Design a protein with these regions (language model features):
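Substrate-positioning beta->alpha
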Residues: 183-187, 201-223, 230
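A hydrophobic C-terminal alpha-helical subdomain
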Residues: 261-307
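Conserved beta-loop-beta element that borders a ligand/cofactor-binding pocket
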Residues: 156-180
Length: 323
């Protein structure tokens, strides 16, 4: 007499998302759920950090044993941990809270993910850590230019300096992420719809303006990847130029300004901002990106065939239509 045994299925892997209430986190939750991933929401602890160097951040993280233990319990049974928490304040001033959210928290999460036996931890960093470098890449070279970008660079440095465990840690440098419901995108649409919409020269420079759709797809690809993922990966370029971004967002062709005039205006602006404690650095950087954009070097995504479908122009057009 033959007997059959029901096929056993391995349980679906669980992904934990910290910062799920924010713009990126909530978009990730929707994208992961659509992809069939079981998502666990984990509340990120609010931390403050006194230190402004990686060794100091590591020492502060080591002292937070209770926080680490509590977080590890919440991450039990999780395969992939994604940190979308933090303070997204490009124009904000330096503070213990900023360093706590963007530098100390990632280390505490990485330690807790190790304790919980997670396979991979993806920390959402920012391409802003490379500041005015002419070429964005996946190297450890950073040139932060503001309190926000310094705090994100500090987070990357602290993760790189911590003793590695069994959980693979990756900092994912998101570029200028846009979404139809994001306030930053609404501001871009407003500017692009006015005579202030302008580019330097012919406007053919690559723009790192990107879509939240592509970012979520990239996070999913990195999390599911069965091989090793580098310590730093860069969100891929979506093929936009400075002119095409403004045209999609504003529905009109931008004004073309002389390159020398744009550079002179930025030099003067940064000089004044420096005298004001970098108060205008964030705004000036947005103008600089609008005029000149920033090139990106192909990296892990291109090498492994994990480049998501570009959606930036569609996202900007959708934002314009709902404005």
């Amino acid at each position: 007499m033959s007997s059959s045994t029901p096929a056993s299925h391995a349980p679906e892997p669980i992904w934990a998302v910290l910062g799920a209430s924010g713009f990126i986190g909530s978009s990730l939750e929707e994208a992961l759920t659509r992809a069939g991933v079981t998502v666990r929401f984990v509340k990120a602890p609010r931390l403050s950090a006194r230190s402004s160097d990686a060794s100091g951040i590591l020492a502060e993280a080591a002292a937070l044993r209770d926080v680490r233990q509590d977080l590890s319990g919440e991450l039990a049974g999780v395969d992939v941990v994604i940190n979308a928490a933090g303070l997204a304040t490009p124009t904000g001033a330096d503070s213990p809270e900023l360093r706590g959210a963007n530098a100390l928290l990632p280390v505490v999460i990485a330690d807790a993910a190790d304790d919980a036996g997670a396979r991979r931890f993806i920390h959402l960093s920012s391409a802003a850590v490379q500041g005015h470098r002419p070429l964005l890449d996946e190297s450890p070279q950073v040139e932060p230019f503001s309190a926000y970008s310094r705090s994100k660079a500090l987070g990357e440095a602290a993760l790189a300096a911590r003793a590695p465990g069994t959980c693979q840690v990756t900092s994912l440098r998101a570029t200028s992420v846009q979404g139809a419901s994001r306030q930053t995108t609404a501001s871009l649409v407003r500017v692009a719809s006015t005579p202030l919409s302008s580019v330097a020269g012919r406007g053919e420079s690559p723009s790192p303006v990107s879509s939240v759709d592509a970012l979520c797809a990239f996070v999913l690809a990195a999390g599911r990847y069965s091989g090793s993922v580098p310590p730093v990966i860069l969100q891929p370029w979506e093929g936009a130029t400075v002119a095409s971004v403004l045209s999609a967002a504003g529905g009109r062709r931008p004004l073309h300004l002389p390159v020398w005039l744009c550079r002179a205006a930025l030099r003067a602006g940064y000089l004044v901002s420096g005298l004001l404690g970098e108060r205008l650095h964030g705004t000036l950087r947005r103008v600089e990106m609008m005029w000149f954009g920033q090139r990106q070097e192909p990296g892990w995504a291109e090498a492994t065939g994990n480049v998501p479908a570009p959606r930036v122009h569609q996202v900007l057009e959708a934002a314009r239509k709902r404005a």
